Amino acid sequence: MIRMGFFLTLTVAVLLTSLTCSEAVPTDKREMERLFDRILLKDQRQCPYCVVHCCPPSYCQASGCRPP
């Protein structure tokens, strides 16, 4: 189960790195929140966007994400 979660997180991170930041991150805050909710588990401490440096640092902190 843990391996599956790790693999899924890794896959999402790799997919996001293949996109440009402008494509990966919506500018509208509500869209961005919906996207976060869809791809993230609530108990994760890092979000893929922060890991690939694609979301604004202020949004990362507000959403509870911790940059690496």
Swiss-Prot record:
Tissues expressed in: Expressed by the venom duct.
Signal peptide: 1-24
Compartments where found: Secreted
Disulfide bond annotation, renumbered to this chain: 47-55, 50-60, 54-65
MF terms in GO: toxin activity
Proregion positions: 25-45
Keyword Disulfide bond: yes
Sites bearing Pyrrolidone carboxylic acid, chain numbering: 46
GO cellular component, one term: extracellular region
Record keywords: Disulfide bond, Pyrrolidone carboxylic acid, Secreted, Signal, Toxin
Key word Secreted present: yes
UniProt superkingdom: Eukaryota
Function: Probable toxin.
Family: Belongs to the conotoxin U superfamily.
Comment field on protein domains: The cysteine framework is VI/VII (C-C-CC-C-C). Displays a mini-granulin fold, a structure composed of two short, stacked beta-hairpins connected by two parallel disulfide bonds. This newly described fold is derived from the same cysteine connectivity as knottins (ICK fold). The name 'mini-granulin fold' comes from the structural homology with the N-terminal region of the human granulin.
Protein name: Conotoxin Am6.8
